[in-house]
């Protein structure tokens, strides 16, 4: 709270991607977001600033604990990923109705959200909204399946992990780019 007037809206801290799926490995980066109730228009800017400051404080604390900053900046201290429920609904509706490559990339990270703190009812409401839109926009599942087939999990014929043979990730599997599960 540190000098901030606490907004009169509920919020929920979300873990995303491998964090959301509980598949986090020891050496991983952060993927997180903030979801908060849509405030009254006159409170919108203060509420946004409050939750961005909270996102900054938490992400910096996680960095101090050894969790690297997300290279794609998908973290709660980024305005794009610190949104009211109405903002998140707009994002997901756009991604579902316009499944272009960038939308599918966001889908593979953000559809695996898991509430880890706060009002989980907000995450439940968002999940219901997403499911309604996916059912109504039937073509999205086909695009998602095609994307999954183009980015298979890193498994060999014998079901062993395929690891990187060069670069800075030699001997490591890149699970955050090749796995996609749902639910929390």
Describe each model-derived feature in a short phrase.
Residues 1-184:
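A nucleotide- and high-energy phosphate-metabolite-utilizing enzyme signature
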């Amino acid at each position: 709270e540190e000098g901030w007037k606490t907004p009169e809206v509920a919020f929920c801290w979300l873990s995303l991607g491998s964090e959301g799926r509980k598949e986090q490995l020891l050496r991983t980066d952060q993927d997180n977001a903030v979801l908060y109730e849509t405030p009254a228009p006159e409170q919108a800017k203060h509420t946004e600033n409050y939750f961005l400051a909270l996102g900054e404080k938490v992400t910096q604390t996680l960095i101090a604990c050894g969790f690297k900053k997300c290279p794609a900046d998908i973290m709660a201290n980024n305005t794009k990923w610190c949104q009211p429920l109405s903002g998140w609904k707009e994002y997901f509706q756009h991604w579902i109705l316009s499944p272009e490559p960038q939308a599918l990339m966001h889908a593979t990270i953000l559809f695996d959200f898991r509430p880890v703190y706060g009002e989980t009812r907000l995450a439940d409401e968002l999940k219901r909204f997403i499911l309604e839109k996916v059912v109504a926009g039937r073509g999205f599942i086909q695009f998602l399946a095609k994307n999954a087939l183009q980015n298979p999990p890193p498994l060999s014929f014998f079901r062993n992990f395929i690891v990187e043979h060069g670069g800075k990730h030699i001997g490591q599997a890149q699970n955050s780019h090749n796995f996609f599960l749902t639910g929390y």
